């Protein structure tokens, strides 16, 4: 065997080992990747029951039903809606019309059994996919900084009952 053929065999074996390692890494990652979906994508695509997903959109007004520690609500992007069932404490910012991301498992009846619910801290923030879906459906409303203004953000919050600070009178010294 010549030096050239040994070098080619060594390079080929090295590339084969690298390809095998890359394939194993991608296979392992495929089991842990959770895809982000909008309600329209969940309704249109054939997603197998039992698949993990992140569902993002707005909490549909009038859809929140609490029963003890459990809550059911609908997430919408303006075109479609998906019901989410969650057991646990909801974030403080969770409310109707507010942006939300629910991560969980798609059930055979089309609901998502969520194990975590995240509420958007700023009503103007929206994932690109959800914002695009809202724009297509005509539910996108321009806010002060170009983002959507959900119905919950339009209503004024509770007013503070604290009185304005008292102004102390100026003392005149003789």
UniProtKB/Swiss-Prot annotation:
Its main location: membrane. Coiled coil: none annotated. Heme binds at residues 121, 125. Residues 130-174 are annotated as: Disordered. Residues 1-7 are cytoplasmic. InterPro entries: CcmE, CcmE-like_sf, NA-bd_OB-fold. The chain crosses the membrane at residues 8-28. Keywords: Cell inner membrane, Cell membrane, Cytochrome c-type biogenesis, Heme, Iron, Membrane, Metal-binding, Signal-anchor, Transmembrane, Transmembrane helix. Residues 156-174 have a biased composition (Low complexity). Belongs to the CcmE/CycJ family. This is Cytochrome c-type biogenesis protein CcmE. It comes from Azorhizobium caulinodans (strain ATCC 43989 / DSM 5975 / JCM 20966 / LMG 6465 / NBRC 14845 / NCIMB 13405 / ORS 571). The gene is ccmE.
């Amino acid at each position: 065997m010549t030096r050239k053929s040994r070098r080619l065999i060594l390079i080929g074996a090295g590339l084969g080992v690298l390809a095998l390692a890359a394939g194993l890494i991608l296979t392992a990652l495929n089991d842990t990747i959770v895809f982000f979906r909008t309600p329209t994508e969940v309704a249109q695509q054939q997603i197998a029951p039992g698949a993990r997903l992140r569902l993002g959109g707005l909490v549909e007004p009038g859809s929140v039903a609490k029963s003890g520690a459990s809550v059911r609500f609908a997430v919408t992007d303006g075109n479609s809606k998906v019901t989410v069932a969650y057991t646990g404490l909801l974030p403080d910012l969770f409310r109707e019309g507010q942006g939300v991301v629910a991560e969980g498992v798609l059930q055979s009846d089309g609901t998502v059994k969520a194990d975590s619910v995240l509420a958007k801290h700023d009503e103007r923030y929206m994932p690109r996919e959800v914002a695009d879906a809202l724009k297509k459906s005509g539910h996108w409303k321009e806010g002060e900084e170009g983002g959507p203004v959900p119905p919950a953000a339009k209503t004024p919050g509770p007013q503070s009952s604290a009185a304005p600070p008292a102004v102390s009178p100026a003392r005149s010294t003789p």
